[in-house]
């Protein structure tokens, strides 16, 4: 069986991804002989140019769990439309479980004002100026997924103009 070699282009695509571990938790499964321990890792993967994903991995060791989390995160990537000032186009909110996240665009120079898992998701998405607030649950996985949900609902100016049947220039006049 012949092995397929990675081309230089595929290697370049792999090198610009960044990953950050949000949480590592030791979990247990009760089996006949007692408790079987394993690790769960929540990982955010992004390239800081508008692509980001959240993954969860479970394995018997921490490194294996993180590796699986990165692979899962790359499977669940979303595209984030960024403005010229590296912010988002409009206010939006996202929900996942009991967690609700509200994100608002901010002026250049504001920075990322957000906490916990939401901050990590926004930074790896490439957003530089944004305000975000977590409401409800403080569960890191649900907050990260709520942030992804909020970023998924973003629309660009051209998409809104196309929906309304007008040109982008006439959108706000």
Curated annotation (Swiss-Prot):
Gene Ontology terms: biological process: translation
Give the matching PROSITE patterns.
RIBOSOMAL_S5, S5_DSRBD
- In terms of superkingdom, the source organism counts as Bacteria
Using the record's annotation, list all stretches that form the S5 DRBM domain: 17-80
Ribosomal protein as a keyword? Answer: yes
Q: Does the keyword RNA-binding apply?
A: yes
Q: Which GO terms describe its molecular function?
A: rRNA binding; structural constituent of ribosome
Q: Could you give one GO CC term from the UniProt record?
A: small ribosomal subunit
Q: Which UniProt keywords apply?
A: Ribonucleoprotein, Ribosomal protein, RNA-binding, rRNA-binding
Task: Let me see what the UniProt entry remarks about domains.
Answer: The N-terminal domain interacts with the head of the 30S subunit; the C-terminal domain interacts with the body and contacts protein S4. The interaction surface between S4 and S5 is involved in control of translational fidelity.
User: Subunit structure, per the record?
Assistant: Part of the 30S ribosomal subunit. Contacts proteins S4 and S8.
Query: Member of which family?
Result: Belongs to the universal ribosomal protein uS5 family.
Against PANTHER family, the record matches this protein to: MITOCHONDRIAL RIBOSOMAL PROTEIN S5 (PTHR48277:SF1)
Instruction: State its role.
Output: With S4 and S12 plays an important role in translational accuracy.
- Name under which the protein is recorded: Small ribosomal subunit protein uS5
């Amino acid at each position: 069986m012949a092995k397929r070699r990675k081309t230089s282009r595929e290697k370049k695509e792999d090198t610009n991804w960044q990953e950050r571990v949000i949480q590592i938790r030791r979990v247990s499964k009760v089996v006949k002989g007692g408790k079987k321990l394993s690790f769960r890792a929540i990982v955010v993967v992004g390239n800081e140019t508008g692509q980001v994903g959240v993954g969860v991995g479970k394995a018997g060791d921490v490194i294996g769990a993180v590796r699986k989390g990165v692979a899962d995160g790359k499977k669940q990537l979303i595209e984030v439309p960024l403005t010229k000032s590296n912010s988002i186009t409009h206010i939006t909110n996202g929900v996942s479980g009991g967690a609700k996240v509200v994100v608002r665009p901010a002026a250049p120079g504001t920075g990322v004002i957000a906490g916990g898992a939401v901050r990590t998701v926004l930074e790896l998405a490439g957003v530089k100026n944004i305000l975000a607030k977590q409401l409800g649950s403080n569960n890191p996985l649900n907050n990260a997924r709520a942030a992804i949900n909020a970023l998924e609902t973003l629309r660009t100016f051209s998409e809104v103009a196309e929906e309304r049947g007008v040109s982008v220039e006439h959108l706000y006049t």
